[in-house]
Amino acid sequence: MGVQANTRAIEKDIVTDFSERMSYASYLDLDTLLSAQKPVSRPEHHDELLFIIQHQTTELWLKLVLHETLAARAAFDEDDIGRALKCVARVKHIQKTLTEQWSVLATLTPTEYSEFRRFLGNSSGFQSYQYRAVEFVLGNKNAGMLAVFEADPAAHDLLGRLLAEPSLYDAFWQCLSRLGYDVPASALDRDVTAAYTLNEDLLPLIKFVYENHDEHWAVYEAFEEFVDLEENFQLWRFRHMRTVLRTIGMKSGTGGSSGVGFLQKALDLTFFPELLAVRTEIGR
């Protein structure tokens, strides 16, 4: 039976009584979720709701990214490359959503933003502890960042713990070592609290896998998944920088940074540098 009078009939078995059942709204705690948007501008500016929702949804996605990257690290700890890459694959899709989401915020014009920006005080996306947590898990660690979160003990403790723990990339190399690959000691014994930097000792092994990928497919696939992960992260950073540029130009950020100039520097930060460096060597 088709639609009559442009109305879809409710099927007889569809549940409508939720007086004693869990509903969609109660499962998702929508009362709490939808009351979490609290504009601070006075009088309330129409476009501030967009600004809040943009950042709140980003935080929700970052929560899932952190959940999946930690699960991937745990899978590497158990030498389960396939399960780890399943988590990474999901993260890659989330990253694409996060990057495209900047196009929504880009509808906020410089004039509109300037009308409520002063009400934000020193609050800034730079203070997103989940974003820093993801960076730490991926290996871009910076102990100095913890100072930003001294007033938030839970965030400070989380970042302190992640700073001291091996990154996803560290766990991967440990996994390969246990599986019999000749991973150099410099990769296995490094200071995991430091930001990851290029380790040329790894290049021969990486090149070997690329040039013999049929015999080492799981590791080869992992290399390419990591490259995707980093590229997606850099595309997000670039869209962030460009959105800020079109919205506030070269003004300083609300949190005290130089703004666009500071964001541009993030484009030089890397997670898996050997996987790009090896491309120069392949085929030589």
UniProtKB/Swiss-Prot annotation:
It catalyses: L-tryptophan + O2 = N-formyl-L-kynurenine. The keyword Transmembrane does not apply. Keywords: Dioxygenase, Heme, Iron, Metal-binding, Oxidoreductase, Tryptophan catabolism. Pathway: Amino-acid degradation; L-tryptophan degradation via kynurenine pathway; L-kynurenine from L-tryptophan: step 1/2. GO terms for biological process: L-tryptophan catabolic process to acetyl-CoA; L-tryptophan catabolic process to kynurenine. Binds 1 heme group per subunit. GO terms for molecular function: heme binding; metal ion binding; tryptophan 2,3-dioxygenase activity. Its cofactor is heme. The keyword S-adenosyl-L-methionine does not apply. Substrate binds at F51, I52, I53, Q54, H55, Y113, R117, T254. Heme binds at H240. Its EC number is 1.13.11.11. Gene3D superfamilies: 1.20.58.480. Belongs to the tryptophan 2,3-dioxygenase family. Heme-dependent dioxygenase that catalyzes the oxidative cleavage of the L-tryptophan (L-Trp) pyrrole ring and converts L-tryptophan to N-formyl-L-kynurenine. Catalyzes the oxidative cleavage of the indole moiety. Homotetramer. PANTHER family: TRYPTOPHAN 2,3-DIOXYGENASE (PTHR10138:SF0). This is Tryptophan 2,3-dioxygenase. The gene is kynA.
